[in-house]
Regions:
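C-terminal structural segment of proteins
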Residues: 1-132
């Protein structure tokens, strides 16, 4: 088996020849948020939003757009290295997150709905992880 970091894995964009069997998350002090939006308990996700804040640095990942999960790099740039996020900065970051990635429509959800979900849950997630 081989190990790789998350950024390298996400850069593969579905070009995998192996099966992902493990995810290793090193323990560190920080706050995190995860939301899986689905229609029923057993459904595949319509959208996934994951946010972590460690030492003033934020990581924002969006999955099930439907596509391979991606880091929201512009969103991360807009909030990183700030002591405390203002309400306006959170709203701006949520807007950036909804705009910087592409979304597609499927039977489960439209692209517009996914985009709206990302905006709402990035806002909620940033509010949650930036609490003191």
């Amino acid at each position: 088996h081989k190990e790789m970091n998350l950024a390298d894995f996400l850069a593969l964009k579905g070009r995998l020849s192996d099966i992902l069997t493990h995810v290793v998350i090193k323990k560190s002090k920080g706050r995190s948020f995860f939301k899986k939006v689905k229609t029923t308990a057993l459904d595949f996700a319509v959208i996934n939003v994951a946010i972590a804040s460690i030492d003033g640095n934020y990581r924002v990942a969006i999955g099930s757009r439907p596509s391979v999960a991606s880091l929201a790099l512009k969103t991360m740039d807009s909030v990183n290295n700030k002591k405390k996020l203002s309400k306006e900065e959170v709203l701006k970051a949520a807007e950036i997150a909804s705009e910087e990635l592409s979304y597609a429509s499927t039977n489960a959800a439209s692209a517009e709905y996914r985009k709206a979900l990302v905006k709402a849950y990035v806002k909620r997630g940033l509010e949650e992880v930036s609490k003191e």
